[in-house]
């Protein structure tokens, strides 16, 4: 329903829609095209809305909530994007906990949108009510319980910034069922102009042209040159920053072998003569001895 035109920097169309469609519009703005999910009572309005967005999203339904979160996690790792998944309240949300914990431990960016009982029933031990924000507090970078429609757009935007900045990880957004159904005005400008804290858009302030940094880099190069048996120990940050090729070129240039953490597997071709494999409890005896 076209609700009117609003003047900002330019005229923009304002549309009246329910909270479920607003969430999907926000996901479109984030460039999301794949969603993992499993339907349930609290997220039925979200799935009703998803039907109208079948051309915008590929929805993959798993047979269990734990599977959908692991799938979203795997998708995030393989595509280097944010994985997105839907789960219902109560048992649906608790079933997702193992997958959320895995993504947290492995620094995998993910946004989990869970359904919740209506706001009027919160805290009343309602059917399939669980304090999922409390339950996942120790295994998410941040989590949110959306209390009203005004919080919906900024919460979704902030969730993606938190998940995909600094050390990446999962974020949970818990949305009561009545907010999926509540009508509100929305335009693309709402999302674009939504203000979030500066620290959410983390960017390294490392400047290669800075004299101090150049000095530090030269000192590091000298230390490497003087080393008798240097080893590069590479982790998951290499993959998440798309730096595998740079790592391989660097290792080749200084003729130094590369050891990987568990999350760093795949940083360098295993057939490369400089690839030693992995250290730690899952590594080989030879790999472990290389750092002793």
PLM features: residue spans?
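N-terminal alpha/beta PP-like core and its mobile active-site loop of ThDP/TPP-dependent enzymes
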Residues: 13-292
